[in-house]
Amino acid sequence: MANTEAFFSQTLAERDPELFATITEEQERQETGIELIASENITSKAVLEAQGSVLTNKYAEGYPHRRYYGGCEAVDVTEQLAIDRAKKLFNCEFVNVQPHSGAQANGAVMLALLQPGDTIMGMSLSSGGHLTHGAAPAQSGKWFNAVQYEVSPETLLIDYDAIEAQALECKPKMIIAGGSAIPRQIDFKRFREIADKVGAYLFVDMAHIAGLVATGVHPSPLPHAHVVTTTTHKTLRGPRGGMILSNDLDLGKKINSAVFPGYQGGPLMHVIAGKAVAFGEALKPEFTDYIKQVVANAKALAEVMVERGCDIVTGGTDTHLMLVDLRPKGLKGNAADAALERAGITCNKNGIPFDTEKPMVTSGIRLGTPAATSRGFGIEEFQKVGHLISDVLDGLVEMPEGNPEVEARVLAEVRELCKRFPLYR
């Protein structure tokens, strides 16, 4: 008879010290550094607890009360709780919480509503779109006739008239709105008018702005879109995962079939539990306060970056993120990204609209405020962060291979700032 006592009692530190050391190292990195990657956030301890629960043991193919396995009573309640909370949060009629990621949510929508070879229109990566919106290397770019639209070369804003003209020409079956680097509000009503003119589905990917939509800080796409997807981390501050929403129950049936059995097998019930926790947190008044602070912090950070000699794409931000154009300083995104990381500040190199640099080089960086706001940073702290970033960039102008003296000083200041805002305790 095998001895199961150790299997059920040993901690991770005891059972796998090598992996435990790696996780401890990552926790230290998060604790002592400033996270400005716009697509990242910090979940609550309650979300972590749900994700680490015994629900990870349970297979639950199907949907609540329509499963292919027995023993699903508790997970049925869990999934229904996540669905009901999401419906309330976004004021919609249909929700599927099973997608493992935003990319899989997007893929399931396309599987539900399109046939291979259909024409789709999505924003190009260079203008701020996402890989899954028809970029050439992605499945959506290979399976469909993917037409990409750009922002205006003059204003760098979404040019709705140009998109309408393009749609009238190519007659897409689906128009995709949303992206990964759009700092301004999106006019979903105008997008729906364009879609209706050509008989297309309007599909909105609100992964980046879901928290803003949930709190009314950004207009909701749900009154206008046929279908909406989102991730559940980013500004929603939940576990990494995806979700599909709609007010069309007939489309909802197609989407459910596309998610399972079409695109995925068993749902990750421990992650869905984490989603339920996060949606419950987002329904509380303090989450609205948090999102308002995220946006205020982004505006404050953008103002400092401009004051210190950078350009902000579109001149500012209405959301949680901004694109910093480094060309006025003669810098490249990859060098800035690396220098900032050496100084304890994590962001990502990012192309700017009509960038002439390669994707692994870029002319810009993307900055976001959700994660640092989650740990308690306010406007004063983000103004400080803006100056620290600018110090590193100016040091890089002086010494293009890296400025050890400036980076060491900024790193020390970052460490001191982070001590005031500890994470899990």
Swiss-Prot record:
Cofactor(s) required, per the database record: pyridoxal 5'-phosphate
**Pathway the protein contributes to:** One-carbon metabolism; tetrahydrofolate interconversion; Amino-acid biosynthesis; glycine biosynthesis; glycine from L-serine: step 1/1
- Where, per the database record, does this protein carry N6-(pyridoxal phosphate)lysine? 234
Q: Which reaction does it catalyse?
A: (6R)-5,10-methylene-5,6,7,8-tetrahydrofolate + glycine + H2O = (6S)-5,6,7,8-tetrahydrofolate + L-serine
Does the record carry Cytoplasm as a key word? yes
Residues flagged as site, Plays an important role in substrate specificity:
233
Sorted alphabetically, which PROSITE patterns does this protein's record hold? SHMT (PS00096)
Give the enzyme's EC designation: 2.1.2.1
Tell me a Gene Ontology molecular-function term this record carries. Answer: glycine hydroxymethyltransferase activity
List the SUPFAM superfamilies hit by this protein, alphabetically: PLP-dependent transferases
> Which top-level enzyme class is recorded in the Swiss-Prot or TrEMBL entry?
transferase
User: What's this protein's function?
Assistant: Catalyzes the reversible interconversion of serine and glycine with tetrahydrofolate (THF) serving as the one-carbon carrier. This reaction serves as the major source of one-carbon groups required for the biosynthesis of purines, thymidylate, methionine, and other important biomolecules. Also exhibits THF-independent aldolase activity toward beta-hydroxyamino acids, producing glycine and aldehydes, via a retro-aldol mechanism.
How the protein assembles, per its UniProt entry? Homodimer.
UniProt cross-references to NCBIfam families, sorted A to Z: PRK00011.1
Family named by the database record:
Belongs to the SHMT family.
HAMAP family referenced in this protein's UniProt entry, alphabetically: SHMT
The protein, known as? Serine hydroxymethyltransferase
Species source reads: Marinomonas sp. (strain MWYL1)
